[in-house]
């Protein structure tokens, strides 16, 4: 039987999150295997994959020739190649683009729906998992493999773990944690990624932004020293010529409805409102607060006031857990 996603509950901010086990059904896994895997990925993504160790995972972008991202990928070494996690809505088109040059290389690129993606976060997440695995990942060793399972460690917004495993292990983990952990779906993991300032690229925003417009340079996702990759010229120009005028921002506040990916917001200008930005993702938390991830000009005043279009409620800027200073 296929592993069934958990029913949804309103997400909670990291500071108040009880121990929670999540099914990450809005994310999807893909792999590249074969003798040329590393060389092939090195020519396709913004990160320097040749420098990646077995202990690392990182956020990289896969761009078109103009430097616009098809998707961003949470990348790690897997078997004799690599695996990555991205939003399910962009996986198929992203893989189609990635395969375009594969005919000339010894690689196999494929979606992986055999394995299950789970998230564990919240109060004493590490202690709960320590009973189930012999070793857990940490800041020094961010990827751990045990039998059929790969565990990825995340620091922000609070310590959490992403588990890539087979169906049998996923069922075992669910049975073991069911008594002490709340069960939730992808929306809770999405809320944590928004809070952490990790850009969320869904289908509506695929092919729209260069990596720096979503803060990827601040998240260690772009190497400016590696050799050629698709879109490199535009990505480099944005850095060295200051061509990038946008950044990813975190907004919180109230709204009578959740803005959708690809939608704009409105910025208060005196007595008027002016349309601005592009929403990447938004969630409503259990306390009623709305959290929005949006790409806007990178020179916004910190006390700016925003709203969902024509809404009576307002949103304001929250600091991200990393610096954009280069």
Curated annotation (Swiss-Prot):
* Source organism superkingdom: Bacteria
Q: Which residues are involved in binding folate?
A: 27, 189
Which family would the database say this protein is a member of? Belongs to the tRNA-modifying YgfZ family.
Q: Which Gene3D superfamilies match?
A: 2.40.30.160, 3.30.70.1630, Aminomethyltransferase beta-barrel domains (3.30.70.1400)
By its UniProt entry, which Pfam families does this protein fall under? GCV_T (PF01571), YgfZ_barrel (PF21130)
Give Gene Ontology CC terms: cytoplasm
Please name the InterPro entries in this protein's record: GCV_T_N (IPR006222), GcvT/YgfZ_C (IPR029043), tRNA-modifying_YgfZ (IPR023758), YgfZ/GcvT (IPR045179), YgfZ/GcvT_CS (IPR017703), YgfZ_barrel (IPR048451)
Compartments (UniProt record): Cytoplasm
Its recorded name reads tRNA-modifying protein YgfZ
Signal peptide residue numbers:
none
Lineage per the UniProt record: Bacteria, Pseudomonadati, Pseudomonadota, Gammaproteobacteria, Enterobacterales
Q: Name one GO biological process term.
A: tRNA processing
- What function does the entry list? Folate-binding protein involved in regulating the level of ATP-DnaA and in the modification of some tRNAs. It is probably a key factor in regulatory networks that act via tRNA modification, such as initiation of chromosomal replication.
What GO terms are given for molecular function? Answer: folic acid binding
What keywords would UniProt list here?
Answer: Cytoplasm, Folate-binding, tRNA processing
């Amino acid at each position: 039987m296929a592993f069934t996603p958990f029913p949804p509950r309103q997400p909670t901010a990291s500071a108040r999150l009880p121990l929670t086990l999540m099914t990450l059904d809005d994310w999807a896994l893909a792999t590249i295997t074969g003798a040329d895997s590393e060389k092939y990925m090195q020519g396709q993504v913004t990160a320097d994959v040749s420098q990646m160790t077995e202990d690392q995972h990182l956020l990289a972008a896969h761009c078109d020739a103009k430097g616009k991202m098809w998707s961003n990928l949470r990348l790690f070494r897997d078997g004799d190649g690599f695996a990555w996690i991205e939003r399910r809505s962009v996986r198929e088109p992203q893989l189609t683009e990635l395969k375009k040059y594969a005919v000339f290389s010894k690689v196999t690129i494929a979606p992986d729906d055999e394995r299950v993606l789970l998230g564990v976060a919240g109060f004493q997440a590490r202690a709960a998992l320590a009973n189930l695995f012999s070793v857990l990942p940490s800041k020094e060793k961010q990827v751990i493999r045990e039998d059929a399972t790969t565990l990825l460690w995340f620091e922000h917004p609070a310590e959490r773990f992403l588990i890539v495993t087979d169906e049998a292990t996923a069922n075992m983990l669910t049975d073991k944690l069911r008594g002490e952990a709340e069960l939730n779906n992808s929306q809770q993991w999405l809320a944590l990624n928004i809070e952490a300032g990790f850009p969320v690229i869904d289908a509506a925003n695929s092919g729209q932004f260069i990596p720096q417009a979503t803060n990827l340079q601040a998240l260690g996702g772009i190497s400016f020293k590696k050799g050629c990759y698709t879109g490199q010229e535009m990505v480099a120009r944005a850095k060295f010529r200051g061509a990038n005028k946008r950044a990813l921002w975190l907004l919180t506040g109230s709204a009578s409805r959740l803005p959708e990916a690809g939608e704009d917001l409105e910025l208060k200008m005196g007595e008027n409102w002016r349309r601005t930005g592009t929403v990447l993702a938004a969630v409503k938390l259990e306390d009623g607060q709305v959290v929005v991830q949006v790409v806007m000009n990178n020179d916004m005043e910190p006390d700016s006031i925003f709203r969902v279009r024509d809404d009576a409620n307002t949103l304001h800027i929250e600091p991200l857990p990393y610096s954009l200073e280069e």
